[in-house]
Design a protein with these regions (language model features):
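Conserved RNase H-like, two-metal-ion catalytic cores of nucleic-acid enzymes
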Residues: 3-4, 8, 14-53, 69-70, ...
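Conserved catalytic core of nucleic-acid polymerases
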Residues: 458, 570-571, 575-578, 653-786, ...
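C-terminal polymerase-core module
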Residues: 477-480, 484, 488-540, 707-755, ...
Length: 842
């Protein structure tokens, strides 16, 4: 029989620092709990124990503190973000029916030692899961230790038994106490013998066997005089340290292994806790969805609508929910009903002429098109409203919104219940938008944009299939040539795509200096290869190989698979994903078509108009910097834009203290990096890496920039301070981003949050402007040039397809609409070109 005992404080600490911060909608930190549960699940899978329990420290002094006042005195206080998770973590363990053992005046290590001792006495195997090596002294024939090491995004474990311990330390596990007595332990502020480090301590134990043995042989000639003096002076501390480092397996706890035998979870209690923590994936992972039916119903804020067989034809407004199984839920003022997939497809659903409430209206309209159902006008989108209210959430399901806003418990598969929830959500979410000052954002930008995106997705864009095939063939030939070159340098064939084989070749066979190490060996990522490219000709060849294979798989082959029967690619624009409000695209992702290399830019040649047409490409010029100039109110930056001076040249003149006409191309490139780096809160280290200068020079560039653009400097300070005070930052159009991490005690987390606070108003406002431009361009084209169609939005550019004969007029219209989308204190400029491909138009 096997028992697994977790060192609760140690494991949750490692989870806290090893998992990216997570918060609930209300700002409750949850990542330590999430990480703890992941470690627990992994340990249970690996060890397959019959029993599981957890030991925690209790607040207050222990017998060690009474013996030595300085014990653990150098430890930092527990971060507040972790402290708030501790009681909830224990609630979760109780709901899982996992016993918790604690003992006032004793440490968790002593409790664990006691559990291990009792297990050994009853012939149980005991596996201790901890991140602290203190517990290694407990190893014996029945007790093993699983050491957990967590880094951000990565957790590794090592199982120590007696053999593994001897292999690493060279002596028996119990002698770990003697080792700490000699060398001390800075993490617990155990003094040890001053001047004796790990190497010397191990040498002494190897020769004399124990602390007592060392002091019994102080006159041994192998002990150097200075070391002897240190040992004599530190004898009292050595034996004090021995006592402090010794785990006492006599904690007065009521424990028997059978009490910790794995029991079924309290499913309802665990479900409710996971709901509170917003662990949606864990609810499914632990199979807790069914527990919702047993949950006491939350206070309902709405009256249920009566169930009907069908919806009367004269209903003018209704909520429509399309479930994953094809069934359709309908709700209106007097009732709710559901149609089976067959009923919906057989023409029993008529929505023409009705005012409709949808959840994710863009997707819903596509679904209705597939069913051949003509829809009326969408008047409200609940998913879109929820996204505007909390863009950082990852869950906009109807069940989640119903719980949060209505106090209703519904299943996403229940079409009728979800439709009813949508009906009741509309007034609630409308009220929330108004209360939070987001009505304009929703009504003028997000909601009308849905119809535009729906049309753009339907239109798609033509692809030159034959040219794409030829491009793929050319890449295949170049990849083959590249392989031949690489193998000639390596002296034989190997798997170029294998990180291990490539690492062995570069760092062992060819002897190149390792740049970065990972748990599996030396890294060969792009950053490493960039630093090694001048060390051996094989490195540039490998970089070319990777670039070519990426182009082949992602674009030449990937785009070919996405071409539909109409010869066009129909990407999906994701408008409920990014926290800044920017659009992204999938299937395929057209936002990352390469532009920085000549070969990558060739891909744009494959995007063509239909016969008789051209593509018009209109691109905003430096929109984020113009937004920064407006928001920050910086006079120097505003003047540069209003005078139509190249902003990067103007910045270079300011930063380097030279006349505009004397700015060199290199100075302009550096100034450009600073300009855009400031927008993203770049550090001196990152800037130095980007432009290839020292950190000292990078710091000087940033300081000179902020001294010359004082309005920007004041903005940077104020926007972060304001966000820290009110908990969020917002765009000119009222788009908010909540940033609870600004109050984190973790410097790295807090610094990242400050960069978000700095960047969000700029990037978010730019996103709002491009969305407004899309709406204006779509409406203007429909009115004046109905044969012209908006096809794509990629970052700050819009792509329109139009008859060749009106290309000049359409280009002028698109540019004009984009430039006049808002009245800022600096002009917005958009340059429009056209051609027979995206490449030509760009």
């Amino acid at each position: 029989m096997k028992l697994l005992i977790l060192d609760g404080n140690s494991v949750i600490n490692r989870a806290y620092f090893g998992v990216k911060p997570l918060t609930t909608r209300d700002g409750l930190y949850t990542h330590a709990i999430y990480g703890f549960l992941n470690i627990l699940e992994r340990m249970e899978k690996e060890e397959q124990p019959e029993a599981v329990c957890v030991a925690f420290d209790l607040h207050g002094p222990t017998f060690r503190h009474l013996k030595y006042e300085g014990y653990k005195a150098t430890r930092h206080a527990m971060p507040e973000e972790l402290a708030q998770q501790m009681p909830i973590m224990k609630d979760v363990l109780r709901a899982m029916n996992i016993p918790i053992y604690e003992c006032q005046g004793w440490e968790a290590d002593d409790v664990i030692g006691t559990v291990g001792k009792i297990c050994s006495q009853q012939d149980w195997e005991c596996v201790i899961v901890t991140g602290d090596r203190d517990s290694l002294q407990l190893i014996d024939g029945n007790v093993h230790v699983k050491l957990v090491i967590s880094k951000p995004g990565q957790t590794t474990t090592t199982l120590f038994d007696e053999e593994k311990f001897r292999e690493e330390y060279g002596f028996e596990p119990k002698k770990l106490i003697d080792l700490k007595a000699l060398m001390g332990d800075s993490s617990d502020n155990i003094p040890g013998v001053a001047g004796v480090g790990p190497k010397t301590a191990k040498e002494l134990l190897a020769k004399f066997g124990s602390l007592d043995g060392v002091y019994a042989h102080l006159d041994d000639p192998s002990i150097r005089p200075k070391l002897r003096e240190k040992l004599e002076a530190g004898k009292e501390n050595a034996y004090l340290s021995f006592d402090l480092a010794t785990i006492r397996p006599e904690a007065p706890i009521d424990f028997a292994p059978k009490d910790a035998i794995v029991q079924p979870y309290n499913r309802l209690e665990l479900y409710q806790l996971f709901q509170k923590l917003e662990f949606v994936r864990l609810i499914d992972k632990y199979g807790l969805r069914g527990a919702a039916a047993d949950a006491p119903k939350p206070e309902q804020k709405v009256q249920f609508l009566p169930r009907r067989e069908d919806m009367p034809a004269d209903v003018d407004s209704c909520a429509v929910y399309l479930a994953g199984d094809g069934s359709v839920g309908l709700a209106w003022g007097e009732g709710v009903c559901a149609l089976t997939p067959m009923e919906a497809q057989m023409g029993q659903l008529s929505l023409a002429g009705k005012n409709l409430i949808f959840h994710d209206s863009k997707t819903a309209m596509h679904r209705l098109d597939e069913l051949g159902i003509q829809a009326g006008e969408c008047v409200f989108d609940t998913a879109l409203a929820a996204y505007d209210l909390n863009p950082s959430s990852s869950d906009y399901t109807v069940s989640k919104l119903a719980t949060n806003y209505l106090g209703l418990s519904v299943e996403d598969a229940d079409a009728a219940a979800c439709a009813e929830a949508l009906w009741h959500l509309r007034p609630v979410l409308s009220g929330e938008l108004e209360k939070n000052g987001m009505e304009r954002l929703y009504r003028e930008i997000e909601f009308p944009l849905c119809r535009v995106l729906y049309r753009m997705e339907n239109r798609g864009i033509c692809i030159d299939r034959e040219q794409l095939r030829q491009f793929g063939d050319m890449l295949s030939r170049r990849i083959s040539d590249c392989e031949t070159l690489i193998f000639s340098y390596s002296g034989g064939e190997f798997n170029i795509n294998s990180t291990r084989q490539l690492g062995e070749l570069l760092f062992e066979k060819l002897g190149l200096p390792p740049v970065k190490k990972t748990k599996t060996g030396c890294s060969t990522n792009a950053e490493v290869l960039e630093k090694l490219k001048n060390k051996h000709p094989i490195v540039p060849a490998i970089m070319d190989y990777r670039m070519l294979t990426k182009l082949k798989s992602t674009y030449a082959d990937g785009l070919m698979k996405e071409i539909r029967e109409d010869g066009r690619i129909h990407t999906t624009f994701q408008n409920l994903v990014t926290a800044t409000g920017r659009l992204s695209s999938t299937e395929p992702n057209l936002q990352n078509i390469p532009v920085r290399t000549d070969l990558g830019a060739e891909i744009r040649k494959m995007f063509i108009p239909k016969p008789g047409c051209v593509l018009v490409d209109a691109d905003y010029s430096q929109i984020e910097l113009r937004v920064l100039a407006h928001i920050a109110g910086d006079d120097a930056m505003r003047k540069a834009f209003c005078d139509h001076v190249d902003i990067h040249t103007a910045t270079a003149a300011q930063v380097f203290g030279v006349p505009v006409e004397e700015v060199t191309p290199l100075q302009r490139r550096h100034a450009k990096a600073v300009n855009f780096g400031i927008v993203y809160g770049i550090s001196e280290f990152s800037l130095a890496e980007d432009i290839g200068v020292s950190r000292y020079e990078a710091r000087a560039y940033i300081d000179n920039y902020l001294n010359n653009y004082r309005g920007v400097k004041e903005y940077m300070h104020k926007v972060v301070a304001d966000a820290r005070e009110i908990g969020y930052t917002e765009t000119l159009y009222g788009r908010r981003r909540y940033i609870p991490e600004l109050k984190s005690s973790n410097f790295n987390v807090r610094s990242g949050a400050e960069r978000i606070a700095l960047n969000t108003p700029i990037q978010g406002t730019a996103a709002d402007l491009i969305k407004l431009a899309m709406i204006r361009v779509e409406n203007a084209l429909n009115e004046k040039y109905p044969d012209a169609q908006l096809l794509l939005q990629v970052h700050d550019e819009l792509i329109v397809e139009c008859p060749e004969g009106i290309a000049q007029e359409v280009a002028a219209l698109v540019s004009r609409e984009m430039e006049n989308v808002a009245s800022l204190s600096v002009p917005l400029t958009a340059e429009a070109k056209f051609g027979k491909s995206w490449y030509e138009a760009k």
